[in-house]
């Protein structure tokens, strides 16, 4: 006679085996650019719903205390001559990348403001909630040739939540990150220190510590095709002199890149790096990117402004360039794919969307650890809230 519970365990094992076989029958999504070359889809002008800050200890604050202000060097003065190596590594406090934050900070904002959203909880029930960086990866996927990605998706109270999962390859690459690459990462943050002040009209202070725990994040609402979006992204600074003082139109993205000396170098820059800059800035409606070009010694010798809406002009006639319509059409197709695939409303159920360059987006299904990402404090608080969140958003949303 079998011991009590043995049969039940065997049944559970069989269910688990069946569960693990499910991905083989799930659909996939192709990513070739030629499939998405139609007209540019509808994309609602992003509007800022609110913001939050993360302090030097990475603690959340529902305000703008971490916001910095754009303060470039005088136009008629000498060249910038910023030493991006200054303070490395002595005045550098990098964020602990082993801590997987998932959507937690954004979810805290949603929890605090869910009843103030235009359209109410019903709008949220039809929306996709994620980080801007996750959407950026989707936009660039048709042209990406090196790095794959994984996105975990769960549906809860109608809302689709997307949270990135670090791929094994990305983790191995991060843990083996060479010293030069770590220093280059520091240089990007150091450039921000040279270009930003703590107060409007103030002067930058590059003598302080570079602490990458600190962040100011904008929370935005938009719609791509028929997909309402609520997403958040880190903002480098606000330009007090911007023609439009309404966020996100007054925000500025800061970037660094190596100096270019040949047409071939510029062509490669436009094809690859500028694509990522465009995607990152277009999604939240940031109007321009200010780039500092550094020499081999790590000094910024020149600054150049790239208006977001003009970036595509640099590759418009390049057969190996990128097309904004392809990027946005693929993102819209992925959102439709995810919405139709993730149908069960269960915060502990995860559909893991995986992609490697050259292949389609595939799906596997998982329950609980290690892929479940909606925290219990969020699920419990939202569950205790309004009883019915089934309203479908109207097209105007």
Swiss-Prot record:
InterPro entries: RAI1 (IPR013961), RAI1-like_fam (IPR039039)
Compartments where located: Nucleus
GO molecular function annotation: 5'-3' exonuclease activity; magnesium ion binding; mRNA 5'-diphosphatase activity; mRNA binding; nucleotide binding; RNA NAD+-cap (NAD+-forming) hydrolase activity
Positions that bind Mg(2+) 1: 192, 236, 253-254
Entry-annotated residues carrying Phosphothreonine: 392
Chain positions found as Phosphoserine: 394
Keyword presence, Metal-binding: yes
Sites where the protein binds substrate: 58, 101, 131-133, 217, 234, 255, 280
Residues annotated as binding Mg(2+) 2: 192, 234, 236
Keyword Phosphoprotein carried by entry: yes
Cellular component aspect of the GO annotation: cytosol; nucleoplasm; nucleus; plasma membrane
EC number(s) on file: 3.6.1.-, 3.1.13.-
Catalytic activity entry: a 5'-end triphospho-ribonucleoside in mRNA + H2O = a 5'-end phospho-ribonucleoside in mRNA + diphosphate + H(+); a 5'-end NAD(+)-phospho-ribonucleoside in mRNA + H2O = a 5'-end phospho-ribonucleoside in mRNA + NAD(+) + H(+); a 5'-end NAD(+)-phospho-ribonucleoside in snoRNA + H2O = a 5'-end phospho-ribonucleoside in snoRNA + NAD(+) + H(+); a 5'-end (N(7)-methyl 5'-triphosphoguanosine)-ribonucleoside-ribonucleotide in mRNA + H2O = a (N(7)-methyl 5'-triphosphoguanosine)-nucleoside + a 5'-end phospho-ribonucleoside in mRNA + H(+)
Domain of life of the source: Eukaryota
Record's cofactor remark: Binds 2 magnesium ions.
Primary location recorded for the protein, binned into one broad class: nucleus
GO BP term (any one): nuclear mRNA surveillance
Keywords: Exonuclease, Hydrolase, Magnesium, Metal-binding, Nuclease, Nucleotide-binding, Nucleus, Phosphoprotein, RNA-binding
Primary enzyme class: hydrolase
Cofactor(s) needed: Mg(2+)
Functional summary from the UniProt entry: Decapping enzyme for NAD-capped RNAs: specifically hydrolyzes the nicotinamide adenine dinucleotide (NAD) cap from a subset of RNAs by removing the entire NAD moiety from the 5'-end of an NAD-capped RNA. The NAD-cap is present at the 5'-end of some RNAs and snoRNAs. In contrast to the canonical 5'-end N7 methylguanosine (m7G) cap, the NAD cap promotes mRNA decay. Preferentially acts on NAD-capped transcripts in response to environmental stress.
Protein family according to the UniProt entry: Belongs to the DXO/Dom3Z family.
Record's protein name: Decapping and exoribonuclease protein
Originating species: Rattus norvegicus
High-level lineage: Eukaryota, Metazoa, Chordata, Craniata, Vertebrata
Gene (UniProt): Dxo
């Amino acid at each position: 006679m079998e011991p009590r519970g043995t049969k039940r365990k065997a049944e559970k094992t069989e269910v688990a085996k069946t569960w693990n076989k499910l991905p083989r029958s799930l659909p996939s999504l192709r990513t070739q650019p030629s499939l998405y070359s139609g007209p540019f889809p509808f994309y609602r002008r992003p509007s800022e719903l609110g913001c939050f800050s993360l302090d030097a200890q990475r603690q959340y604050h529902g305000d703008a205390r971490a916001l910095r202000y754009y303060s470039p060097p005088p136009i008629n003065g000498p060249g910038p001559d910023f030493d991006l190596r200054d303070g490395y590594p002595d005045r550098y406090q990098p964020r602990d990348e082993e801590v997987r934050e998932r959507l937690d900070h954004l979810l805290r904002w949603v929890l605090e403001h869910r009843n103030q959203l235009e359209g109410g909880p019903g709008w949220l029930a039809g929306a996709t909630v994620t980080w801007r960086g996750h959407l950026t990866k989707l936009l660039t996927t048709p042209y990406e040739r090196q790095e794959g990605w994984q996105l975990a998706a769960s549906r809860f109270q109608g809302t689709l939540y997307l949270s990135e999962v670090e791929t094994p390859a990305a983790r191995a690459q991060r843990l083996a990150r060479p010293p030069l690459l770590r220093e280059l990462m520091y240089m990007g943050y150091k450039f921000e220190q040279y270009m930003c002040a703590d107060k409007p009209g103030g002067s930058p202070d590059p003598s302080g510590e570079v602490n990458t725990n600190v962040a100011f994040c904008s929370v935005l609402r938009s719609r791509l095709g028929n997909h309402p979006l609520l997403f958040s992204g880190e903002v480098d600074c606000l330009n007090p002199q911007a023609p439009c003082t309404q966020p996100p139109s007054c925000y500025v993205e800061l970037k660094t890149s190596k100096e270019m000396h040949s047409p071939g170098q510029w062509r490669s820059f436009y094809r690859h790096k500028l694509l990522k800059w465009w995607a990152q800035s277009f999604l939240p409606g940031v109007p321009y990117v200010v780039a500092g070009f550094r020499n081999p010694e790590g000094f910024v010798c020149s600054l150049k402004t790239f208006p977001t809406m003009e970036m595509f002009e640099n590759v418009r006639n390049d057969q190996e360039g990128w097309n904004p319509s392809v990027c946005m059409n693929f993102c819209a197709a992925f959102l439709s794919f995810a919405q139709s695939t993730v149908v069960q409303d269960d915060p502990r159920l995860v559909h893991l969307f995986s992609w490697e360059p050259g292949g389609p987006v595939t799906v596997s299904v998982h329950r609980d650890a290690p892929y479940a990402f909606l925290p219990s404090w969020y699920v419990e608080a939202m569950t205790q809230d309004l009883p019915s969140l089934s309203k479908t958003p109207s097209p105007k949303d």
